[in-house]
Regions:
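Glycine-rich phosphate-binding loop used to anchor ATP phosphates in small-molecule kinases
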Residues: 143-194
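Conserved phosphate-donor/acceptor-positioning beta-strand/loop module used by diverse small-molecule
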Residues: 193-215
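Conserved GTP-binding G-domain of TRAFAC-class P-loop NTPases and closely related GTPase folds
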Residues: 209-282
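N-terminal pre-Walker A segment at the start of P-loop NTPase domains
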Residues: 2-27
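Conserved substrate/cofactor phosphate-moiety recognition/catalytic segment
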Residues: 54-165
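Conserved glycine(s) of the Walker
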Residues: 45
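Hydrophobic positions on the alpha1 helix immediately C-terminal to the Walker A/P-loop
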Residues: 49
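The conserved Walker
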Residues: 41-42
């Protein structure tokens, strides 16, 4: 799949499907499909643990439709170019500033993603802080003057397409800002399906030091490919607690509420500790 050189390139739903589906849609369909909502902090090892868990169920990871925002972002050539340029001007103390460029990319409605302005503002921010402190976020000044859908919106379009074709789905996400995302964003689309899904929410956890080491390794690999998707190591503690809190909120809600089409029996909640590789069914 070629890179998205502008947001125009990403507007084709077939391009999104091609990224999410490793096989033809018909090969991913099921009369009794699963939706695996895979949550956890970045670098916790969600993909590896989900693959192992599915294999134990007699299912294969590649036979699922993989809904992932990061998989779309990695196709955005302006994002890759910008983050790599900025990365070379950062230190370990302010590498988290790359998150600002990531957020600008996924929310942008501008045909060129408006990344140059973001890049310049972040470099200025680094210089003002002496390279050691993160200043407060600046306000966006780029007008959203095109009717194009953002990458976040395109992810949901791709998700909806998979649901309407009742394919087995893995929805890979980090529950940080929106702790109620499963109820407010994911389930309304699942409920559109012509067939009923079995929903399994998997929270992958690990010790903080282990996650930081994995992120550093992942960053080295990304740098070799001329781009980087960064998480500030100092934010790991907060991300771990946010995902665990969101998991418990969803578990409490879905295991105690009858929503009509979907009942508590249609949901399963599983914790996987990737520090010890011990699975905990809770």
């Amino acid at each position: 799949m070629s890179n998205f050189t502008s947001l125009h390139n990403a507007q084709n739903i077939n391009a999104i499907i091609h990224i999410f589906a490793k096989k033809p849609i018909k090969e991913l369909q099921s009369p009794t499909p699963y939706c695996i909502v895979l949550v956890g902090a970045p670098g916790v090892g969600k993909t590896t643990q989900a693959s192992k868990y599915l294999h134990e169920m007699g299912l294969e990871y590649d036979n699922f439709y993989h809904v992932s925002l990061d998989s779309l972002v990695e196709k955005v050539k302006p994002y890759r170019n910008t983050t790599f340029r900025v990365y070379k001007q950062l230190t370990s103390n302010n590498i988290g500033l790359l998150n600002s460029i990531y957020l600008q990319t996924i929310k942008s409605h501008n045909k060129n993603f408006s990344l140059k302005a973001t890049e310049n503002s972040r470099i200025k921010q680094i210089k003002q802080s002496g390279g050691t402190k993160r200043k407060r976020s600046i306000k966006r000044s780029i007008k959203q003057n095109t009717p194009l859908k953002s990458l976040m919106e395109l992810r949901e379009e791709g998700f909806k397409h998979g649901v309407m074709n009742h394919v087995n789905i893995i929805y890979d996400t980090t529950l940080s800002i929106s702790k109620d995302k499963i109820r407010t964003d994911i389930m309304p689309i699942i409920e559109m399906s012509p067939v009923k899904y079995k929903i399994i929410v998997i929270l992958v956890t690990a010790d903080e030091d282990i996650i930081k080491n994995r992120i550093e390794k992942r960053q080295r690999n990304m740098i070799s490919k001329q781009y980087i998707r960064s998480v500030n190591p100092k934010a790991i503690t907060k991300l771990i607690s946010q995902n665990e809190e969101a998991y418990e909120i969803s578990k409490k809600y879905f295991k105690s509420n009858n929503m009509g089409i979907y009942t508590p029996d249609d949901f399963e909640f599983i914790k996987i500790d990737n520090s010890t590789n011990v699975n905990n069914l809770k």
